[in-house]
């Protein structure tokens, strides 16, 4: 664990040898007269905990995990400096955990939201006027293929 990517207070620790790289952002800040505020103590702790939890699973999962210390988050643009200096270069995805004003009995996670999607078509005679039809099944298949391809590229 050493300062890295142009920031003296940044660090990175990588687990695993082969496979797609998953970056866990360990966000922190030291604000004058406040210290670690805006949930950065929770963000850093959760990201480190997730990384340590994955440490013994990286070979089994076929991934690499990088814990990336991202300082200067309140106005300093720490992640921007890290991005400009290549810290996220090989990442297939990067994640972080952030506290918010949600009830733990009914949490909201944007990554697992459910959506109801309806496809509407328009009937047409295949021989008489096929150009007047709208095939809803084509749109549905396209959504499935694109969502599946996107998921495959994540890891």
Task: Please report, for each region that a protein language model flagged, where it lies by residue.
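A non-catalytic alpha/beta surface segment that caps or lines the substrate-entry region
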Residues: 1-17
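Active-site beta-strand-loop-beta-strand hairpin of nuclease catalytic cores
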Residues: 19-23
């Amino acid at each position: 664990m050493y300062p890295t990517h142009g920031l003296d207070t940044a660090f990175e620790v990588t687990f695993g040898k082969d496979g797609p790289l998953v970056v866990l952002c360990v966000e922190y800040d030291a604000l004058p007269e406040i210290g670690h505020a805006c949930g950065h103590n929770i963000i850093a702790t959760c990201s480190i905990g997730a990384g340590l939890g994955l440490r013994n699973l990286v070979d089994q999962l076929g991934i690499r995990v990088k814990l990336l210390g991202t300082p200067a988050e309140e106005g300093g643009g720490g992640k921007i400096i890290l991005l400009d200096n290549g810290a996220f270069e090989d990442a297939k995805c990067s994640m972080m955990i952030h506290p918010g004003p949600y009830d733990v009995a009914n949490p909201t996670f944007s990554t697992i939201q459910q959506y109801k999607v309806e496809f509407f078509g328009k009937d047409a005679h295949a021989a008489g006027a096929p150009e007047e039809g709208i095939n809803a099944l084509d749109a549905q298949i396209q959504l499935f293929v694109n969502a599946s391809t996107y998921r495959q590229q994540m890891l």
